Amino acid sequence: MAPGSWFSPLFIAVITLGLQWPKEAATFPAMPLSNLFANAVLRAQHLHLLAAETYKEFERTYIPEEQRHANKNSQSAFCYSETIPAPTGKDDAQQKSDMELLRFSLVLIQSWLTPVQYLSKVFTNNLVFGTSDRVYEKLKDLEEGIQALMRELEDRSSRGPPLLRSTYDKFDIHLRNEEALLKNYGLPSCFKKDLHKVETYLKVMKCRRFGESNCTI
């Protein structure tokens, strides 16, 4: 079977769900803080799921199994987001204030706004990255949601120093397809990792602020 000619039912379901994301849900009108958090968490969960399934399908389609372990341990696995002091897990996140976590989340989201528009140019399989425009829209929706939360919680007297804005723009989109594929192998992996961080931060904030007994992170 030719690479990219089949996809798992879960991946197809994720893409379908993404395309059906209602436009009216993309806005963040005035609403209770609990609803703002709930909406932001749902958007982050959806994007993380989409990123994880995209990475699986990309790896299954393009990367021979014997190369996967070596590639994951190479420089290609480095993520630019590692250059900012963002928490790496739930325990670390719980040591940060809500505003700090929102600022980290915003930087992570904004670091992807440009590169997601290039994904379909880097990788040849349009079924894997052909929805990059929709992913960009969802990132913008989540960015707006995080900014709305920051406006609600903002305490200007406790603002920290500006964060270094990481970038994924250095990934090369001008190489031949095979070369670009290997050079940029870490891109979908980093996207998945960064969205997982954002989802974790938002869940930590929502759980400790509203004390949900059934909260899972």
Swiss-Prot record:
Zn(2+) binds at H46, E199. PANTHER family: SOMATOTROPIN, SOMATOTROPIN,PROLACTIN. CDD domains: somatotropin_like (cd10285). Belongs to the somatotropin/prolactin family. Disulfide bonds join C79-C190, C207-C215. The lineage of its organism: Eukaryota, Metazoa, Chordata, Craniata, Vertebrata. Keywords: Disulfide bond, Hormone, Metal-binding, Secreted, Signal, Zinc. GO terms for biological process: animal organ development; growth hormone receptor signaling pathway; negative regulation of apoptotic process; negative regulation of gene expression; oviduct epithelium development; positive regulation of gene expression; positive regulation of growth; positive regulation of receptor signaling pathway via JAK-STAT. The gene is GH. GO terms for molecular function: growth factor activity; growth hormone receptor binding; hormone activity; metal ion binding; receptor ligand activity. Growth hormone plays an important role in growth control. Residues 1-26 form the signal peptide. GO terms for cellular component: extracellular space. This is Somatotropin. InterPro entries: 4_helix_cytokine-like_core (IPR009079), Somatotropin (IPR034975), Somatotropin/Prolactin (IPR001400), Somatotropin_CS (IPR018116). It holds the Pfam family Hormone_1. It is found in: Secreted.
